[in-house]
UniProtKB/Swiss-Prot annotation:
This is DNA-directed RNA polymerase subunit Rpo10. It comes from Sulfolobus acidocaldarius (strain ATCC 33909 / DSM 639 / JCM 8929 / NBRC 15157 / NCIMB 11770). Its EC number is 2.7.7.6. Belongs to the archaeal Rpo10/eukaryotic RPB10 RNA polymerase subunit family. Part of the 13-subunit RNA polymerase complex.
């Protein structure tokens, strides 16, 4: 789906780090190194980015018209 704006646990903003994280990991960089360089140090925030699955393109086909 869409990346949450804030971490569910601590409330820190994580959405602004999604694009750089995603681009760098898709480019072949190590996710641990990327998160550290982006300043995501808490493990609760790290899991928000690591466990996110972008499935909005698949789900949009199953919505009903309003």
């Amino acid at each position: 789906m869409i990346i949450p704006i804030r971490c569910f646990t601590c409330g820190a903003v994580v959405a602004d780090k999604w694009e750089p994280f995603s681009n760098r990991v898709m480019g072949g960089e190590d996710p641990e190194k990327v998160l550290t360089e982006l300043g995501v140090n808490r493990y609760c925030c790290r899991r928000m980015l690591l466990s996110h699955v972008n499935i909005i393109r698949e789900i949009i086909h199953y919505t009903r018209p309003i």
